[in-house]
Amino acid sequence: MTLAPTFIARGLLAALMLIASPWANALVFAVNEGVTYRVPLEEVRGRYAAIAADLSKILKQPVTVEPVGDYNLLRRGLASKSYDLAMIHPAHVSIQAIKGSGYKLVAITKGYQKYTASFLVQPDSKLNSLADLKGLKLGAPDEDSITSWMVRATLRDAKLDPAQMSITYTRYQDAVPFFVENNLTQAGATAANALVKAWQTKGGKILAQSKPVPIKHILASPNLSADQIEKVREYLIGLDASDEGKKKLEPTKYTGFEKYDEAKMLELGAWLGL
């Protein structure tokens, strides 16, 4: 069957309109909320809708929110520069993108500047320092979580080789105290403040803590101009300065954003082993 010329012309016109549409050149704002948190991806999309709408106006280009739950998928997107903007929970993935793909640190999230891993032990534990963990079992969150990257760096600071230790990794941080309580491990590491407080309330001890590391970073692709990046930074940092901005922040559950020295971030990357 031969297609009518009019039908073909309409098809070509539709294709040309799609190419010319601003949505064909939409900027992608990837959002990752961490590997150990149970947040549905569609819920993540809704949380950032108002901010994405503002960014569309500021950059004069549509901005679409793309939730990314898997770290390896996130890494691939950053490596290929598929994401123009990215909200990244784990510091190690951010640092890898800055070092390897030329991304720029735009801002970090207030309230998450000093993310710290705590090593939990039983109230009657005879352990006095991290060095005492040699030859013992340690519970920790997902192996690729920022918490576990921090845990391994802290163990190295204590002259312990993580590769030669018995570390039991678990998908969720709230399983770590269970390991210690039930003597499945002699210590457990978590960076969840609620878990640490609950542990101490029950009489549990904190054996040691890691260096603090800021998490939940906003990065910008090298495909964006310096002017565009600065506009995004000014917008994000100024969000909590007005009632309207605070309202837009509410769905994200964050209080605001602030600047952070990219060089300091890279120094932390060296400590993490990147």
Residue ranges and their predicted role:
Residues 19-24:
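N-terminal signal peptide c-region/cleavage motif recognized by signal peptidases
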Residues 90-100, 152-153, 157, 178-209:
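A ligand-binding cleft/hinge motif common to bilobed small-molecule-binding domains
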Residues 65-76, 165-178, 213-214:
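Short helix-initiation/N-cap motifs at beta->coil->alpha
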Residues 68-132:
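Acidic, polar ligand-binding/catalytic clefts
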Residues 37-54, 91, 115-178, 182, ...:
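Bilobed "Venus flytrap"/periplasmic-binding protein-like clamshell domains
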